[in-house]
Amino acid sequence: MNKLLMVKYASEIFLKGLNKNKFEKILKHNIATALNGVKFDFVFDSGRWFIKGEDLEEVVDRVRNVFGVAEVCIVTEIENDFDTIKNQALLAVKESGKGTFKVETNRANKGFPLNSMDINREVGAYILKNNDEVKVDIHNPECLVNIEIRKKTYIYSKRIKGVNGMPYKTNGQTLLMLSGGIDSPVAGYMMARRGVEVSGVYFHSAPYTSERAKDKVKDLARILTKYIGEMTLYVVPFTDIQMQIIEKCREDELTIIMRRFMMSIACKIAEDKGMESVATGESIGQVASQTMQGLVVSNDCADRPVFRPLISMDKIDIMDISRKIGTYETSILPYEDCCTIFVPKHPKTKPILGQIRKAESVLDKEKLINDAVEKMEVIQIKND
């Protein structure tokens, strides 16, 4: 009798046809990466993955956060002996401490002499006979006893939800515009959850923003590596660009012109590093630069797709996800970033593209962008 972790992967993977094996292979690699430093072995039995390890609680905590994992269950592995199956199912109900139960069987091993309905009926009757404190509830049981009969039998009563999604690094690359706020880390998480490899770019305005602000962004990236393993963070010096904009452009146009520079720089880095897209944490109408007109004007600088996974979400929903993934408490630390300094009193909310292009024509945009990219710092962030 052994305790193992059974891994059920996202149903989308089953829909990949001839590519399913590729997705499974990458998911298995990602699970192994998540378990770095933990002693474990993979066991495969008739279409199910199992993990054998010394510290299953630690294994559960790591594997449940791997994109592509739908569910994990700590199972008891036993021989295909019906008396043993009945006794182990009885024990599972007793250990649950619940008052109602139901038995569900998946008989993948068609050589087993009883079919699934017979197993459910006989095991349920055995539990009732040997435990007078419980009763059957087939519609809403407090304890669901799952029996999977394969080369061996696996019994479990507790399911732990995974994060679902697609296996990481199966769907291209994006450069996330990562600030120190609540939104952009959530956007990065949501892109990664769809299998997109995520790197980050942070615009640093020293000395107006402190090293603590930069450290905060590094900490946010590190939290994301809990889900993606590692992340490259590009830190771009942005002060010279901001000073030029402040000196030569109208105050009410500062924000949108700064956003256009950020977009241009992000696209240049993405091109240089072979990334197909840029991602942001923008949500329509949330701030002055995120009106429909503002997004159109900033998008004008993009030479590749710009993904905004939060575009239609309310702030409260974004905050809920931020708490769930563990970035919220870091995001609300009171360190200013380049987006919160030099904010005009009355920024334009309906910028006109032609006017903004004309306004920034007084700047040597190409030189400013190239200088910033040339001076950028590259930091590798890994899951500790």
Curated annotation (Swiss-Prot):
GO molecular function, one term: tRNA-uracil-4 sulfurtransferase activity
Catalytic activity: [ThiI sulfur-carrier protein]-S-sulfanyl-L-cysteine + a uridine in tRNA + 2 reduced [2Fe-2S]-[ferredoxin] + ATP + H(+) = [ThiI sulfur-carrier protein]-L-cysteine + a 4-thiouridine in tRNA + 2 oxidized [2Fe-2S]-[ferredoxin] + AMP + diphosphate; [ThiS sulfur-carrier protein]-C-terminal Gly-Gly-AMP + S-sulfanyl-L-cysteinyl-[cysteine desulfurase] + AH2 = [ThiS sulfur-carrier protein]-C-terminal-Gly-aminoethanethioate + L-cysteinyl-[cysteine desulfurase] + A + AMP + 2 H(+)
Pfam families: ThiI, ThiI_fer, THUMP
An annotated GO cellular component: cytosol
Entry keyword annotation includes rRNA processing: no
Record-level GO BP terms: thiamine biosynthetic process; thiamine diphosphate biosynthetic process; thiazole biosynthetic process; tRNA 4-thiouridine biosynthesis
Positions bound to ATP: 177-178, 202-203, 259, 281, 290
Main location: cytoplasm
EC identifiers of the protein: 2.8.1.4
Metabolic or biological pathway: Cofactor biosynthesis; thiamine diphosphate biosynthesis
SMART domains cross-referenced by the UniProt entry: THUMP (SM00981)
Enzyme class: transferase
Domain THUMP: 57-160
CDD domains with a match to the protein in the record: PPase_ThiI, THUMP_ThiI
Localization (cell): Cytoplasm
UniProt keywords, alphabetically: ATP-binding, Cytoplasm, Nucleotide-binding, RNA-binding, Thiamine biosynthesis, Transferase, tRNA-binding
Record-stated family: Belongs to the ThiI family.
Its job: Catalyzes the ATP-dependent transfer of a sulfur to tRNA to produce 4-thiouridine in position 8 of tRNAs, which functions as a near-UV photosensor. Also catalyzes the transfer of sulfur to the sulfur carrier protein ThiS, forming ThiS-thiocarboxylate. This is a step in the synthesis of thiazole, in the thiamine biosynthesis pathway. The sulfur is donated as persulfide by IscS.
NCBIfam families: tRNA uracil 4-sulfurtransferase ThiI (TIGR00342)
Name of this protein: Probable tRNA sulfurtransferase
